[in-house]
């Protein structure tokens, strides 16, 4: 049995098979709805249910009208009418499962590892700047990491991994990983990408390894000879946590359209740059965010607070806020009322 999915206030309809989620059905039909973790944690895919009934995994049946239904977890019980944040016709890159070889391991800080992977000779995996891959572990578990390389270099992948004590991958597998070892990865996933049809100024916010997908996007913009205005705010505890701050500073010197503002929450006395929380630094410089697109990647606290502050005090509409919130593996499925935002998930 299949049900009909209708997108409210549009002429878009598509079928959804029994036990298929709304997100999966949309992708099968050639439509793209924002998502990230696909596990019901990040809420990137949250949308409204205007009419009909859905079963949300881990929750009871939901009847319209409802807000913030996790479409990656929602299975129709009837024909339904939905109101996703965004929906677009898009032909995504073909997803591939690849045995990748560890090419290089660098540790710019005690807790950050830059992991360069290479794919078999002649094999490329096209992706959009800002997307992520899944590392498939031998027991069937998985971890998600943003790709920091640009799409022009799609014969491998660069991952920025923050070590978390007790982390299944970051603190266990990574500790013994050596050059020449292999990892099985699947890619690409995610919707944390610039809209190619827009030329509006962009503000990026990053905390920690949230810099990874932004690096991919900016290097893609450089390769495409774009002149779209971009301002990156990268928040960290101290200068050491800005593990590739010299690269961002180099972009700022070389590209007239790019600005870089590092923000430290625990600065030393010699620091003369921005201090505090990265979202507050943005508001200090841009009290009015109308006419801009905002992309936030990093801790869930930062992305959630940025959305709240920007929409309530800086005139930013929610459809212009895009986020990728890193959340630990194993978090429980968020209830439909959760307000936390997106996630290309740095996992442990």
Segments the model singles out, each with a brief description of its role:
Residues 1-80, 229, 233-348:
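Reductase modules of NAD(P)H-dependent flavoproteins
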